């Protein structure tokens, strides 16, 4: 007995030990599996498979044990002394199973079942019953026998598959070969339910929560304790048992508030069907019972007078009794009418048939019949008026439909909520009716409220079956799989020596260095201690860490090295590895993991906060694969677990160091993704963080697509989601950009790797990692040296796409990609050419980083993160091997840069991976170049420079880049400068290798870049500056500064204007060493970019996927020598660098000074404008007074003249030209108080100036045509003319019509007379004549007075020999038809149409002749001239009275002719021999009066003395020039085009006249 007692004691001790090990093992097993392993669907398949596997539990444990030796020791230490046994009833039924640890399992118990994979939690089930199966049935070879007490059979669980053994073969039916199996019914964890199903459940719960209290599942701990019961039964070996648990049932989510998250406790509310993948609650179960029924009081009808109860609220809608025959005839008639109406509306018989066959047509007919008291005749008469009822879709406005669809998406089919929140004007019944109409429309296919049942299997989290599992089994993996016991064996490590061997281990979650055993587990397969592993296996999540402990120093040595290397190797490697798996993972988005790869508390929070796939935190690709794509749309695959881990470590460290923990916690805002501390420079860090999002890969499906397309592996950052929305939008934009963006010259990109010669800017020193982008941020600054940076990661970074810097999202416009600064400076220079390609590249999207070629220059370690970027090199760039040569880089960069622009995605943030990791895509930070996008629109020349800009735009986060980023912010317009190609990207980098492609690009850019979206790039002038400075150094010297004429004069111009020439030069130099010579500190550069932006706040973000509501924090994030980086908005996990972060230059910095100067300048301009405005008002008042007086006089004179004679006006005041400005003469382009505008002329400016003219807007001058010239002797006389007709507009209308008819007749008569040889009028003699002395003058003058026919301002305009009869007729009728009642906009429109009509007159031979007279100075003079004569008629819009000279009418001629200083008509001036068309000449401001001495009178009083003097000088010079030109003109009459036969006589005479005069 004593021996037996001793044995029992020993057994109990052993059991205790085993129990502990078992517990550990269970927890380990449940560590981190993304998807639940397959479950066998055959009853005994699990046990059978397990038995056939012929392996012991020990062996399973050994597979995952820390070392082989330890495994061997474990095996040796497992004697068959630990016995498990079961109890039976007399009938042979097994009532309980007792393990060696004395844990008793009975049918009905809820238990944990081992899951084969270490990263998958235990499965949870309830035991239905036990049964013994003989080994022969299981085809199993039994291990060594174990012995047990006679009364029961023993099952040695730990060492071998349980076996029913009895010492002497006793035990009812027991034998050594028996296996104890159990039937279990599964419970599913939320991570084992398809994400699509669970998310809809969460949505429903949220929508139905009217209690005002938060649901219990908002607590992440309780959320993970919810299970879903199922009816699915499976058979497992008893050896798979890993402990007992408690599962409570609650009727609904509200009742679950009572649940307490105790140890081993769970709850369930709903059931789950693994076959259909549906939850009971969402599958339309029949909701019966008290909980689903409304509680209504009994009906209490109103008493009727006679005492009987009635229901007064019923409405009779049909009375049977109509004979079927009559009813059918009536319906046929109704349908016929409907068909006819449908045909009339739709235009085809088919439409009619559709209308007739609709149910609502029939219902409407029946309702009408009922309302007509069943009188078919009356009903049909009523139907004639409305045979077809108004369709439901016609009753809903577009806005209402949008709201309805929004409500469906937000609240599901909760129509009460939709009505309450979004459509209060509609009845709930209308919503339901409309829903059934809407769900049949094509739009509903993509917006269905709940399509959970149609989700593809792809989204399931259940993993693929293995060969051993039937394909159609939806259940858990066969028991054999579970018995693998991924965790170390349960009783291993018993001995001290085994623990000693493990002293070197440390848990990657809690960092403890003491544990019974060590096994990889958790969703990320990290090394865990026993406690953490078991907690994960039980609850599906790692335990929260209450007191964070610093990780042992030895844990992160490798990471530290990478960090130290800042070369970006680490990041690159990470990115590369991640990127390599560019495909999406099926699992939900991953959680970032802590440096050691463990899930940090932050990560844990993140994980708990959002549904993650079982392996959400897992970095390993395996895990992710296992994950079902719960949030596949939001998540990008993460490849290479290790790289990710290192990246994560870096990130985490940085987060803690830089207080970015918050960001990390909030899923590390995109900016933060890249650990700031890690980034070479803080600023860069920021930017890299933003990029890091890119690292993760945008979670946005679009982003993902882009990643895939780009072929560069997307770099999913742990926080993939964050970057999602923004980067996705941005990427989409980028994608939209022409593929060209890809930078056709990608090959050259690598070279830019900063020519070795170019010293990398010290500033950039730290930027080694992708962060370099930040340097780019200060692009010029560090860039020059850092060009090297690009060099640094020569190859790598060259390809670095700079994935879309954060800005990219903002930069949706092509040009942001424009200059992915990412390429080293040289790259930037090269970039210009590539830019075009960039455009095309757009598709690669921010993640395009791939450009596999990466120019993997071993090249410098690429201190910058850029190196990683190489991988960014778009696929197209892949060739960028050229990058290998730093100098070549320049070209290569171009292509690369092109690519980069394309992917400015914020992914840039990817932390600088050590250069060593060229493959890894550098964070797209480099993309800063994107920045150009916003600014690009300003100056093409900056293209080369833009790279830097792009950087800026893309890198808002990096402090150095701050200015740029802010710039980009300011320039969100970048979106508008869409095409990165802004230069005709057609320009080949090749233009000159020496010349950085960027330069070439600039050259290629059309100076007018601004004119086209593409130009947008050029327009980036402000941006240019940055690129110019920093990049130039990097780029090959060949590149000329954008400002240099060689490059592209236009681009240069803009860039120079926007920034110091030096910087411009640098920019153009791109990689030109000169850039350094223009000593623009990198910081400066970025500052300049900021300058451009001028505003610290970033512009509103471009459209992007939804993100958390931002909260204003305005906390300083990072500081550099010249600026401070502020975080303005906090969006939780999803942050946008362009709107959430901004730079503020430090007080003494150059940028601050520039901004102050800009502000001062703006103030001065505003004050000046205010003064001018006041002066203008005063002038208007004075002019109004004068106008009123003159109008009264003119009215009297007009009446007198009209009554005296049809067209003859004796009053010289009203001489033809007197009261009219030349047709389409734009009112003075500027106001007298404003100095003349010497610059290019634009129609928009002229139009604005017209509106600004005081007299134009004068109410008393409403009817004055803007194109009419003023009287030479009295410029304001015309202002009084409207008074003649203001009394009664209809009178004027009638008069105008009558006069027009009379004048036409007279003109025709005159034309006939003019054709007679004797009738000629010589201009020299005409000048001195008073208009009234000419017998025909009254007609011309009269027609001028009657504005519509306006033949011309000059009295003899219609009769000048220079006009052929047809031309005169046209001119007489050509004037715009202006009516008194016309509004100013209408008048302007009429005049514009008139100008266009006049453009057709250029076919006139004389007009063509005059076109030959265009001289180079015309254009120049036009600018001066048109702005000097402020209030005189502007020749640009002349033309009502004569052919519009191409030089006069900008609509007719090209830009060069926009401001031809004089009309093509003759000058009534003695200085000229045979004048051009006088009627046009007189309209010109210079010749508005007969003689120069009259000039002052032609200038409105508001004109200053200085302006008048200028005008006089200009007139004098113009007259002399015109006189000379006129002589030449008439000396070459043969140059005019052919003329009509009717003109032969006239032209022959004209030629003779010219000969005589000459």
Swiss-Prot record:
MF (Gene Ontology): chromatin binding; sequence-specific DNA binding; transcription coactivator activity; transcription corepressor activity; zinc ion binding
Keyword RNA-binding: no
Ranges where the SANT domain occurs: 391-443
Residues with the N6-acetyllysine modification: 1150
Listed Gene3D superfamilies: 2.30.30.490, 4.10.1240.50, Homeodomain-like
UniProt keyword Plastid present: no
ELM2 domain boundaries: 284-387
Intracellular or extracellular location(s): Nucleus, PML body
Residue ranges, annotated region (Disordered): 1-90, 464-495, 542-1125, 1154-1238
Sites of Phosphothreonine modification: 120, 593, 1111
Disulphide linkage map: none
Keywords in alphabetical order: Acetylation, Coiled coil, Developmental protein, Isopeptide bond, Metal-binding, Nucleus, Phosphoprotein, Repressor, Transcription, Transcription regulation, Ubl conjugation, Zinc, Zinc-finger
Domain comment as written in the entry: The interaction with ATN1 is mediated by the coiled domain.
Residues annotated with Phosphoserine modification: 53, 56, 142, 304, 594, 600, 613, 642, 656, 675, 679, 1098, 1105, 1107, 1258
Example of a GO cellular component annotation carried by this entry: PML body
Gene Ontology biological process terms in this record: branching morphogenesis of a nerve; cerebellar granule cell precursor proliferation; cerebellar Purkinje cell layer maturation; cerebellum development; chromatin remodeling; dendrite morphogenesis; radial glia guided migration of Purkinje cell
Protein name from the UniProt record: Arginine-glutamic acid dipeptide repeats protein
Polar residues bias spans: 465-474, 709-720, 778-792, 1012-1023
Subunit structure: Interacts with HDAC1 and ATN1. Interaction with ATN1 is improved when the poly-Gln region of ATN1 is extended. Interacts with FAT1.
Domain BAH residues, every copy: 103-283
Coiled coil start-end: 1148-1203
Compositional bias per record (Basic and acidic residues), positions renumbered to this chain: 1-36, 624-640, 652-673, 688-708, 1154-1198
Linked residues for Glycyl lysine isopeptide (Lys-Gly) (interchain with G-Cter in SUMO2): 560, 637
Residues with the Phosphotyrosine modification: 1251
Comp. bias (Pro residues): 806-823, 902-932, 1027-1053, 1098-1109
